[in-house]
Each structure stands twice: as C-alpha cells, then as structure tokens.
Amino acid sequence: RIMAALSRGQNPGPESSIMKNLGANLGQRITELALEAVGDYIVPHQPWQPGSNDLPVGPSAGTMAMPRYFNLRASSIAGGSNEVQKNIVAKLVLGL
C-alpha cells in the first residue's frame, strides 16, 4: 500500500510510520536474541591481520552480533524517533 500510494504521488499515510516502528522493534529484538544465542562469545571486533594464523574466537556469528546490535539500536532514531512516529500516527489516525 505504501509503495502504491507513493507511485501515485499520494501521501503514504500512517502506515509508513507504523511499519517504521514495527521494523525497528523487530530488528532490535532479533539482534537481542542473537546476543543471547552467542552468549560468552560476543566480541565487539576481531580484526583480521594479514599473515595471522589466529583462529576466530567462538562461532562466526559472534563476530558480527554486537556490531549489528549497536547498529540496529540506531534504527529507532533514524528517520524520526519512535516517539515522533507514534505522534504522527496519533495525529493522522486519531486526529489528536
């Protein structure tokens, strides 16, 4: 619906704000679950050094779990904070 409205040159309505909030919350929950799954192997960064024979510590998912978590925390701010998006929905749907 959102893309169809935009292609017709119309305002996407409150759906885009709702989808933004749902997507941000879902992404954050998924990365929180990934951190729990990786457990003690959470590492913020393991840079590869040329010529190094060091093996990565823990499962390969552990090397990106923390950066993804931090990156997706910003998704609730980017494009307007969740609170701003909720205010937009309240104005458009409820007329507040």
Task: Please report, for each region that a protein language model flagged, where it lies by residue.
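Alpha-helical interface subdomain recognition
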Residues: 1-96
